[in-house]
Regions:
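Long, low-complexity segments enriched in small/aliphatic residues
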Residues: 1-50
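Long, contiguous, secondary-structure-rich segments that constitute the structural scaffold
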Residues: 44, 48-64, 68-176
């Protein structure tokens, strides 16, 4: 509390400015994406391994979604979708589950970033890293820890040809 930071008053509090900002985002983007730690790897370590790859859907990171949200968007189990907001867009494979609340979707963090066009600043991530969609800001000026791994998004069926996953390809070397 002695640092004088508005966001660190020294006791639990309700941040109405942040709540108002979140309400504005929710009005534009109807689905709340929660990104948790993965069960098949340690953060992003071993994403290239067989255990992690076995969890992918058509090579993409899985996204869990309530069937009613999927039905409203013409999305089916096992299909690939585009998940997007103002910060970017990713591809993900869909699992449907009644255990996910309507209006909420869940993905694990740690899929290796695989931009469709590495030269483009907001290129589509074809592998499914939710960090593309979350805000890049610390939790406070005091701690600079990770902010909550959640954001507001919309989801649409991917109807184009799927681009190949290249995140696991070895680097290209130039011989001199």
């Amino acid at each position: 509390a002695g640092f004088g930071y508005r966001e660190c008053p020294g006791h639990p509090w309700w941040d109405e400015q942040e709540a108002a900002r979140q309400r504005q985002e929710a009005a534009r983007w109807p689905l709340h994406l929660l990104s948790s730690q993965p069960r098949a790897r340690l953060h992003s370590q071993y994403d290239h391994g067989s255990v992690s790859r076995a969890t992918k859907i058509q090579g993409r990171e899985p996204l869990w979604m309530h069937p009613s949200d999927a039905q409203a968007r013409d999305i089916r189990e096992g299909s690939v979708v585009k998940v997007y907001n103002d910060r970017g867009a990713i591809l993900a494979g869909v699992h449907l589950s009644e255990q996910i609340l309507p209006g909420v979707v869940q993905m694990s963090t740690g899929a290796w970033y695989d931009p469709l066009d590495p030269k483009e600043e907001r290129s589509l991530d074809k592998h499914g890293n939710p960090n593309v969609l979350t805000e890049d800001r610390g939790s406070s000026r005091l701690g600079q820890g990770c902010s909550a791994q959640s954001c507001w998004v919309e989801i649409a069926p991917w109807r184009e040809e799927l681009p190949p996953i290249t995140a696991f390809d070895p680097p290209k070397f130039i011989e001199v």
